[in-house]
């Protein structure tokens, strides 16, 4: 029972960290990254469809994304979706592919991105702390139900805290790596 509580908490924390990594991947740092387009949805036959299911996304140069649709008839729809997205990048349509040139970031924009990153980090830490609280509550219920002893409860709480500390350290590490990437010119 005790190991199950820790394992469950650890898995949930890993999911929170994976979500944080995805969110941080969407913050552009002046260089092309295909994950920038992960959230772009294109209306295809009346249904919103992820762009990466309708086109191949390549990086021919360090600051250029190239979107090549599998079906050339939806080129205009893809271009429209890219215009309407919150990317802040103007697509260039040459008739068969769409090129997205990633502009260099200004110092001010870099600072804004670091602030936005801070929000992602904080929400990940809140999620991790909530998972810890849930695990602690489950452990206390197990002790009240006489499934584990009071000593086992203390050991379990210490183990849950260690897992939590490791997850928070990993979130901080991801933050420092991304901040360095954002602030490097």
Curated annotation (Swiss-Prot):
Keywords: Cytoplasm, Protein biosynthesis. It comes from the Bacteria. This is Ribosome-recycling factor. It is found in: Cytoplasm. One of its GO terms (molecular function) is ribosomal large subunit binding. GO terms for biological process: translational termination. Gene3D superfamilies: 3.30.1360.40, Ribosome-recycling factor. Responsible for the release of ribosomes from messenger RNA at the termination of protein biosynthesis. May increase the efficiency of translation by recycling ribosomes from one round of translation to another. InterPro entries: Ribosome_recyc_fac, Ribosome_recyc_fac_dom, RRF_sf. Belongs to the RRF family.
